């Protein structure tokens, strides 16, 4: 894909994921398409296959059978497997995984060196503003709070100019105060970024605040895919998910 078409492709592409991966107690077997912008949440109890799906999309795990198509690019099929380093994915893990010997500014600059397109969809100045990083740029990761580290990790994921951002429970390691501090930044990211995102969580409060679409998983199967606004009124598909929602509603 040529850099001159990056902005246009973000609005026109579809993202289709079809996977079959054996797990210890079930076979992950999913087939779904996500919107070409906004946040799609993978929601379900621990061990339902959410992180496995992200790893397969990122190329960190190869599905026994599968098809992953992002826009006009096939990342996996019977005949094709694009390695992880060639997939235009920004990945945010549960822990920030920043480079400890670099400052915040240097971590962000390093991401720019790894970007997938010569034309920028988002600039350094934009992510610094979105995530409130201006006062942190000269600091080392070990001097940051958990929430601050995740803000840097989110900014870094965007600066590689990905086609897709994957977030694997990015708030799960934070205390409640840190979660509440970072949620407004995630909301701003949602409002400002045109890059589609997949957000993994078993916390309905986070999903209700951040996501547009929810894919409900249980034991490796999709129980439901709908908008977040419509989902709570029709929860009959996942008992564990209903318990999670009842806790917050």
Region roles according to the model:
Residues 159-163:
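A short, proline-enriched helix->beta-strand linker immediately N-terminal to the Walker B motif
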Residues 140-144, 148-150:
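Conserved ABC ATPase signature
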């Amino acid at each position: 894909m040529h850099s001159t078409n990056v902005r246009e492709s973000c609005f026109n592409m579809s993202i289709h994921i079809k996977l079959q991966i054996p797990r210890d107690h079930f076979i992950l077997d999913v087939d779904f398409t996500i919107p070409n912008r906004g946040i799609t949440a993978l929601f379900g109890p621990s061990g339902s296959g959410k992180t496995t799906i992200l790893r397969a999309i990122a190329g960190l795990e190869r599905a026994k059978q599968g098809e992953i198509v992002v826009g006009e690019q096939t990342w996996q099929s019977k005949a094709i497997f694009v390695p992880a380093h060639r997939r235009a994915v920004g990945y945010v893990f549960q822990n920030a995984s920043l480079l400890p010997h670099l400052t915040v500014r240097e971590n962000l600059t390093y991401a720019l060196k790894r970007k997938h397109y010569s034309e920028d969809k988002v600039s350094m100045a934009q992510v610094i503003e979105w995530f409130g990083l201006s006062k942190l740029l000269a600091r080392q990761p070990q001097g940051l709070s958990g929430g601050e580290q995740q803000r840097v990790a989110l900014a870094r994921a965007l600066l590689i100019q990905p086609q897709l951002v994957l977030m694997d429970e990015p708030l799960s390691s934070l205390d409640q105060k840190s979660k509440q501090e970072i949620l407004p930044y995630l909301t701003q990211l949602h409002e400002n970024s045109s890059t589609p995102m997949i957000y993994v969580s078993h916390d309905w409060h986070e999903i209700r605040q951040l996501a547009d679409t929810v894919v409900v998983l249980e034991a490796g199967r999709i129980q439901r895919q709908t908008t977040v606004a419509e989902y709570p009124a029709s929860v009959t598909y996942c008992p564990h998910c209903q318990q999670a929602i009842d806790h917050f509603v």
